[in-house]
């Protein structure tokens, strides 16, 4: 029995895609039933002059409260690919905490992110192999892969330089967009005019400047995933963005209302939310 338990922890029985509830930030975990792991962003506290409801007065990082306990509870000890979509604090702020707790085989970043000297300095302190991703690169997952669609040029490491990943996993197409906004969406559509995605991780936490009408009309998603902090000061997701989803009958799941969003399955996905 002990041996069976060890096999189950190392090689989970189901495939998984989880949008972890990290407050106002992003962190998405993928694991195949073979044990392959990809983590897209790690979240991180955004510092404001006035505390928001979702912020704690302690110095505990968001990762220590949510992401790290979640991964440990799932029996994760190694992350094959840690993709840092861009350099905003709410996506990479808890990098050091995550690196202390898990073996990271490779950190993947955009070329533009490496133009930020402060970010490069942090990467050097972690001492993990760093690989730059460009459009066309692929990361293996679930007998398929996550394909890098964007960026296609060296940017500035900001929102519209976010790494965008697309994967057809268990028959469903997922698009993970980082903090991509309208300008980046337009470039993506120009490069991939027939791109469709059944599940869209909404860019920039559902901000007004992301998930444009043209983008949604081309992708034609049936489900939008929004990662945002409860009562966050930016008022993400924006009401206008939510209305754009509703007008197109796109179901919305959001971490600030629903908690973590998890897909699991062998050959077909089922989904659940966990607070």
Question: How should these model regions be labeled?
Answer:
Residues 1-275:
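Non-globular, low-confidence helical/coil segments that flank catalytic cores
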């Amino acid at each position: 029995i002990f041996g069976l338990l060890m096999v189950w922890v190392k090689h989970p029985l189901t495939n998984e895609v989880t949008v972890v509830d990290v407050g106002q930030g992003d962190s998405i975990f993928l694991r195949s039933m073979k044990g392959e792991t990809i983590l897209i962003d790690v979240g991180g506290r955004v510092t404001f002059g006035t505390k928001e409801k979702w912020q704690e007065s302690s110095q505990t990082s968001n990762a220590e409260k949510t992401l790290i306990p979640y991964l440990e509870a799932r029996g994760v000890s190694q992350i094959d690919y840690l993709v840092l979509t861009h350099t905003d604090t709410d996506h990479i702020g808890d990098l050091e905490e995550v690196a202390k707790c898990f073996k990271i085989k490779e950190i993947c970043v955009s070329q533009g992110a490496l133009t930020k000297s402060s970010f490069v300095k942090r990467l050097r302190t972690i001492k993990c192999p760093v690989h730059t991703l460009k459009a066309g690169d692929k990361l293996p997952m679930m007998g398929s892969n996550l394909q890098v669609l964007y960026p296609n040029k060296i940017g500035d490491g900001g929102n519209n330089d976010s790494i965008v990943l697309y994967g057809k996993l268990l028959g469903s197409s997922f698009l993970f967009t980082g903090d991509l906004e309208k300008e980046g969406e337009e470039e993506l559509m120009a490069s991939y005019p027939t791109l469709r995605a059944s599940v869209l991780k909404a860019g920039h936490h559902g901000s007004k400047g992301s998930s444009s009408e043209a983008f949604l009309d081309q992708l034609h998603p049936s489900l939008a995933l929004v990662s945002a902090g409860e009562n966050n000061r930016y008022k993400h997701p924006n009401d206008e963005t939510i209305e754009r989803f509703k007008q197109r009958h796109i179901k919305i799941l959001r971490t600030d209302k629903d908690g973590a969003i998890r897909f699991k399955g062998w050959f077909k996905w089922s989904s659940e939310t966990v607070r």
